[in-house]
């Protein structure tokens, strides 16, 4: 496996792969890799001949007073995990490499999909995501790109971008990977102290209860939201940002009673750490 830091080096690697007619899988990450990322790299390795993992803490998707400086940076460990899971290249550029101009060019998806949920409290976040992912798509020219369902809103935004900008690639979405006790794997889990970590288990418990309500026939969105909200509020260390349901795809307003496929998403703070989690409510096949 090769660790590279420049656009020129990545272009060289991609040109060589293309010359051999290799299929390319891209796994964009912000580093601090965990088992969730590992599942993406494993899938990319299984489905493609050549795998690029990008490790870049993208400054443009962090707002003021967010955790850009505190975000964990563990490049050596990231490279080890990426190599173990079958990556051919780790691309770890500097901010200057990815944003060479004084003034930036932006790729922005508009509409409900970027305005609801995290878009309300993090207004510049998705513009930063779509811009950096566009750059990575242009550089790596992947046949397939891999993202996790944990970032469900990001996935919907990127699906829309891929469709609207005619990117010739397949967006592959992999299931949420959880700890044994149910907590969704996240690089930000490292911020939690022991009591916050225990408190955070209320997220997966409440979402599981919602899924059980839905399976038992409950279709009233307000009742499901109320039950999840009540469940989370029962944990005194929790501070709810949102508990909401939107229709899939593209996070449209829901029909009530619920029908089709819907995303139940939560964002909750434990201490200073904001965690997100979600579950899809739909008829079982």
Where does each model-flagged region fall?
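Nucleotidyltransferase catalytic core that binds NTPs
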Residues: 2-237, 246-250, 280
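Phosphate/ribose-recognition catalytic cores of enzymes acting on nucleotide-derived substrates
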Residues: 227-285
């Amino acid at each position: 496996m090769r660790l590279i830091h420049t656009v020129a080096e990545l272009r060289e690697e991609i040109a060589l792969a293309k010359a051999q007619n290799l299929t390319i899988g891209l796994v964009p990450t912000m580093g601090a890799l965990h088992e969730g990322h590992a599942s993406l790299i494993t899938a990319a390795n299984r489905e493609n001949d050549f795998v690029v993992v990008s490790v870049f803490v993208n400054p443009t998707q962090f707002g003021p007073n967010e955790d850009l400086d505190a975000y964990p940076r563990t490049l050596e460990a990231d490279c080890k995990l990426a190599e173990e899971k079958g990556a051919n290249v780790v691309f770890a550029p500097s901010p200057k490499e990815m944003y060479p101009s004084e003034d930036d060019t932006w790729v922005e998806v508009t509409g409900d999909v970027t305005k609801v949920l995290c878009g309300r409290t993090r207004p510049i976040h998705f513009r930063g995501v779509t811009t950096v992912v566009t750059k990575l798509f242009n550089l790596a020219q992947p046949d397939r790109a891999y993202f996790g369902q944990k970032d469900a809103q990001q996935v919907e935004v990127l699906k829309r971008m891929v469709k609207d900008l005619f990117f010739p690639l397949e967006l592959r979405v992999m299931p949420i990977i959880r700890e044994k006790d149910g907590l969704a794997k996240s690089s930000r889990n490292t911020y939690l102290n022991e009591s916050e970590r225990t408190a955070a288990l209320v997220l997966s418990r409440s979402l599981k209860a919602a899924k059980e309500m839905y399976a038992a026939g409950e279709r009233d969105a307000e009742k499901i939201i109320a039950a999840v909200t009540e469940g989370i509020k029962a944990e005194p260390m929790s501070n709810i940002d949102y508990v909401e349901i939107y229709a899939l795809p593209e996070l449209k307003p829901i029909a009530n009673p619920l029908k089709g496929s819907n995303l139940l998403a939560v964002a909750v703070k434990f201490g200073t750490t904001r965690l997100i989690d979600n579950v899809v409510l739909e008829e079982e096949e």
